[in-house]
Protein backbone atom coordinates (compact mmCIF):
# COMPACT_ATOMS: atom_id res chain seq x y z
CA UNK A 1 0.00 0.00 0.00
CA UNK A 2 2.80 2.40 0.92
CA UNK A 3 4.59 1.71 -2.36
CA UNK A 4 1.45 2.30 -4.43
CA UNK A 5 0.66 5.53 -2.58
CA UNK A 6 4.25 6.75 -2.96
CA UNK A 7 3.99 6.33 -6.72
CA UNK A 8 0.72 8.27 -6.71
CA UNK A 9 2.22 11.04 -4.57
CA UNK A 10 5.27 11.29 -6.83
CA UNK A 11 2.91 11.69 -9.79
CA UNK A 12 0.56 14.16 -8.10
CA UNK A 13 1.73 16.08 -5.02
CA UNK A 14 -1.84 17.17 -4.29
CA UNK A 15 -2.61 13.59 -3.32
CA UNK A 16 -1.00 14.29 0.07
CA UNK A 17 -3.60 16.79 1.39
CA UNK A 18 -6.43 14.66 0.02
CA UNK A 19 -4.98 11.63 1.78
CA UNK A 20 -4.81 13.62 5.01
CA UNK A 21 -8.42 14.75 4.63
CA UNK A 22 -9.54 11.19 3.90
CA UNK A 23 -7.69 9.84 6.94
CA UNK A 24 -9.23 12.53 9.15
CA UNK A 25 -12.72 11.78 7.87
CA UNK A 26 -12.29 8.07 8.46
CA UNK A 27 -10.88 8.62 11.95
CA UNK A 28 -13.74 10.91 12.96
CA UNK A 29 -16.72 9.01 11.58
CA UNK A 30 -15.46 5.77 13.13
CA UNK A 31 -15.72 7.44 16.55
CA UNK A 32 -19.52 7.42 16.28
CA UNK A 33 -20.33 3.86 17.35
CA UNK A 34 -23.74 2.24 17.55
CA UNK A 35 -24.00 -0.73 19.94
CA UNK A 36 -24.81 -4.10 18.40
CA UNK A 37 -25.87 -7.35 20.11
CA UNK A 38 -23.15 -9.51 21.63
CA UNK A 39 -20.86 -6.67 22.69
CA UNK A 40 -19.95 -5.58 19.17
CA UNK A 41 -20.59 -2.21 17.56
CA UNK A 42 -21.38 -0.73 14.17
CA UNK A 43 -20.03 2.46 12.63
CA UNK A 44 -19.35 4.08 9.29
CA UNK A 45 -15.77 3.91 7.99
CA UNK A 46 -15.36 5.96 4.81
CA UNK A 47 -12.99 3.43 3.24
CA UNK A 48 -14.85 3.17 -0.07
CA UNK A 49 -15.09 6.95 -0.42
CA UNK A 50 -11.31 7.24 -0.09
CA UNK A 51 -10.89 4.36 -2.54
CA UNK A 52 -13.08 6.13 -5.10
CA UNK A 53 -11.18 9.40 -4.73
CA UNK A 54 -7.62 8.12 -4.42
CA UNK A 55 -7.66 4.40 -5.15
CA UNK A 56 -8.04 1.31 -2.92
CA UNK A 57 -4.37 1.18 -1.90
CA UNK A 58 -4.51 4.76 -0.65
CA UNK A 59 -7.69 3.87 1.24
CA UNK A 60 -5.92 0.86 2.75
CA UNK A 61 -3.18 3.12 4.08
CA UNK A 62 -5.50 5.91 5.26
CA UNK A 63 -7.90 3.65 7.16
CA UNK A 64 -5.01 1.69 8.69
CA UNK A 65 -3.54 4.93 10.03
CA UNK A 66 -6.95 5.99 11.38
CA UNK A 67 -7.40 2.61 13.11
CA UNK A 68 -3.90 2.81 14.60
CA UNK A 69 -4.58 6.30 15.97
CA UNK A 70 -7.85 5.15 17.52
CA UNK A 71 -6.21 2.13 19.13
CA UNK A 72 -3.18 4.02 20.47
CA UNK A 73 -4.83 7.28 21.53
CA UNK A 74 -8.28 6.16 22.65
CA UNK A 75 -8.04 2.40 23.12
CA UNK A 76 -10.88 2.10 20.61
CA UNK A 77 -10.72 -1.27 18.86
CA UNK A 78 -7.69 -2.34 20.88
CA UNK A 79 -4.07 -2.83 19.88
CA UNK A 80 -4.30 -6.63 19.90
CA UNK A 81 -7.25 -6.51 17.48
CA UNK A 82 -5.57 -4.01 15.15
CA UNK A 83 -4.57 -6.62 12.58
CA UNK A 84 -8.07 -8.06 12.34
CA UNK A 85 -9.67 -4.60 12.23
CA UNK A 86 -7.26 -3.43 9.54
CA UNK A 87 -7.87 -6.53 7.43
CA UNK A 88 -11.65 -6.07 7.56
CA UNK A 89 -11.93 -2.28 7.26
CA UNK A 90 -8.72 -1.31 5.44
CA UNK A 91 -8.44 -4.26 3.03
CA UNK A 92 -11.75 -6.05 2.51
CA UNK A 93 -13.96 -2.97 2.59
CA UNK A 94 -12.11 -0.64 0.18
CA UNK A 95 -11.25 -3.32 -2.36
CA UNK A 96 -14.72 -4.91 -2.40
CA UNK A 97 -16.49 -1.54 -2.37
CA UNK A 98 -14.23 -0.12 -5.08
CA UNK A 99 -14.82 -3.17 -7.29
CA UNK A 100 -18.58 -2.75 -6.87
CA UNK A 101 -18.28 0.97 -7.63
CA UNK A 102 -16.30 0.38 -10.83
CA UNK A 103 -18.68 -2.34 -11.99
CA UNK A 104 -21.86 -0.34 -11.35
CA UNK A 105 -20.35 2.85 -12.76
CA UNK A 106 -19.60 0.97 -15.96
CA UNK A 107 -23.13 -0.44 -16.13
CA UNK A 108 -25.19 2.56 -14.98
CA UNK A 109 -22.91 5.48 -15.97
CA UNK A 110 -24.08 7.07 -12.70
CA UNK A 111 -21.32 7.67 -10.18
CA UNK A 112 -23.73 8.60 -7.39
CA UNK A 113 -25.60 5.28 -7.57
CA UNK A 114 -22.33 3.41 -8.00
CA UNK A 115 -20.72 5.12 -5.00
CA UNK A 116 -23.78 4.48 -2.80
CA UNK A 117 -23.82 0.75 -3.47
CA UNK A 118 -20.04 0.61 -3.34
CA UNK A 119 -20.08 2.03 0.18
CA UNK A 120 -23.07 -0.08 1.20
CA UNK A 121 -21.77 -3.42 -0.05
CA UNK A 122 -18.24 -2.62 1.08
CA UNK A 123 -19.18 -2.16 4.73
CA UNK A 124 -21.49 -5.20 4.70
CA UNK A 125 -18.63 -7.30 3.30
CA UNK A 126 -16.33 -6.01 6.04
CA UNK A 127 -18.95 -6.79 8.71
CA UNK A 128 -19.44 -10.33 7.43
CA UNK A 129 -15.67 -10.82 7.51
CA UNK A 130 -15.67 -9.73 11.16
CA UNK A 131 -18.54 -12.14 11.81
CA UNK A 132 -16.54 -15.04 10.35
CA UNK A 133 -13.44 -14.12 12.38
CA UNK A 134 -15.52 -14.00 15.56
CA UNK A 135 -17.60 -17.06 14.75
CA UNK A 136 -14.66 -19.41 14.20
CA UNK A 137 -13.07 -18.55 17.55
CA UNK A 138 -15.18 -21.05 19.56
CA UNK A 139 -13.93 -23.72 17.16
CA UNK A 140 -10.27 -22.73 17.26
CA UNK A 141 -9.74 -21.61 20.85
CA UNK A 142 -11.05 -23.75 23.72
CA UNK A 143 -9.92 -24.59 27.24
CA UNK A 144 -9.38 -28.11 28.54
CA UNK A 145 -13.11 -28.42 29.26
CA UNK A 146 -14.08 -27.48 25.72
CA UNK A 147 -15.38 -24.02 26.63
CA UNK A 148 -14.55 -21.10 24.31
CA UNK A 149 -11.64 -19.02 25.56
CA UNK A 150 -12.57 -15.77 23.86
CA UNK A 151 -15.69 -15.12 21.83
CA UNK A 152 -18.40 -17.61 22.87
CA UNK A 153 -20.73 -17.03 19.91
CA UNK A 154 -20.63 -19.41 16.92
CA UNK A 155 -21.13 -18.51 13.27
CA UNK A 156 -24.88 -19.10 13.45
CA UNK A 157 -25.02 -16.15 15.86
CA UNK A 158 -22.29 -13.83 14.61
CA UNK A 159 -23.26 -13.89 10.93
CA UNK A 160 -26.90 -12.79 11.35
CA UNK A 161 -26.09 -10.30 14.13
CA UNK A 162 -23.30 -8.53 12.25
CA UNK A 163 -24.97 -8.93 8.88
CA UNK A 164 -28.38 -7.57 9.85
CA UNK A 165 -26.90 -4.73 11.91
CA UNK A 166 -24.73 -3.56 9.04
CA UNK A 167 -27.53 -3.86 6.51
CA UNK A 168 -28.88 -0.83 8.40
CA UNK A 169 -25.63 1.01 9.17
CA UNK A 170 -24.65 0.36 5.57
CA UNK A 171 -27.26 2.91 4.52
CA UNK A 172 -25.34 5.57 6.46
CA UNK A 173 -22.10 4.49 4.79
CA UNK A 174 -23.76 4.49 1.38
CA UNK A 175 -25.32 7.92 1.75
CA UNK A 176 -22.08 9.34 3.17
CA UNK A 177 -20.07 7.96 0.25
CA UNK A 178 -22.59 9.12 -2.35
CA UNK A 179 -23.04 12.51 -0.66
CA UNK A 180 -19.36 13.42 -0.75
CA UNK A 181 -19.11 12.02 -4.28
CA UNK A 182 -22.01 14.25 -5.34
CA UNK A 183 -20.36 17.22 -3.63
CA UNK A 184 -17.25 16.67 -5.73
CA UNK A 185 -19.32 16.21 -8.90
CA UNK A 186 -21.13 19.51 -8.30
CA UNK A 187 -17.78 21.24 -8.19
CA UNK A 188 -17.11 19.79 -11.66
CA UNK A 189 -14.01 18.06 -10.35
CA UNK A 190 -12.78 15.26 -12.56
CA UNK A 191 -9.68 14.42 -10.54
CA UNK A 192 -7.83 15.35 -7.37
CA UNK A 193 -5.56 17.79 -9.21
CA UNK A 194 -8.41 20.30 -9.36
CA UNK A 195 -9.09 20.25 -5.63
CA UNK A 196 -8.26 23.55 -3.93
CA UNK A 197 -8.64 24.78 -0.37
CA UNK A 198 -11.45 27.13 -1.42
CA UNK A 199 -13.41 24.38 -3.12
CA UNK A 200 -12.87 22.02 -0.20
CA UNK A 201 -13.94 24.57 2.41
CA UNK A 202 -17.40 22.99 2.98
CA UNK A 203 -15.77 19.59 3.45
CA UNK A 204 -13.23 21.04 5.88
CA UNK A 205 -16.05 22.68 7.83
CA UNK A 206 -17.80 19.31 7.94
CA UNK A 207 -14.63 17.77 9.41
CA UNK A 208 -14.50 20.57 12.00
CA UNK A 209 -18.13 19.87 12.95
CA UNK A 210 -17.31 16.18 13.36
CA UNK A 211 -14.39 17.09 15.63
CA UNK A 212 -16.71 19.15 17.83
CA UNK A 213 -19.37 16.43 17.95
CA UNK A 214 -16.99 13.49 18.38
CA UNK A 215 -17.65 11.64 21.67
CA UNK A 216 -14.47 11.39 23.75
What are these regions, as identified by a protein language model?
Residues 10-12, 37, 108, 148-155:
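Helix-boundary and loop/linker segments of multi-pass membrane transporters
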Residues 132-145:
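Membrane-helix interface motif
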Residues 89-131:
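Short helix-perturbing small/polar motifs within transmembrane alpha-helices
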Amino acid sequence: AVKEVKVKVDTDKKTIPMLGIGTSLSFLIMMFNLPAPGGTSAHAVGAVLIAILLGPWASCLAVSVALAMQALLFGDGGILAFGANAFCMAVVMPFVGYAVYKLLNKWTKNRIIASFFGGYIGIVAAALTVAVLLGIQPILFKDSSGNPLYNPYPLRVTLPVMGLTHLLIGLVEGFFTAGVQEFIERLNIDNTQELTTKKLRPLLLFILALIILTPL
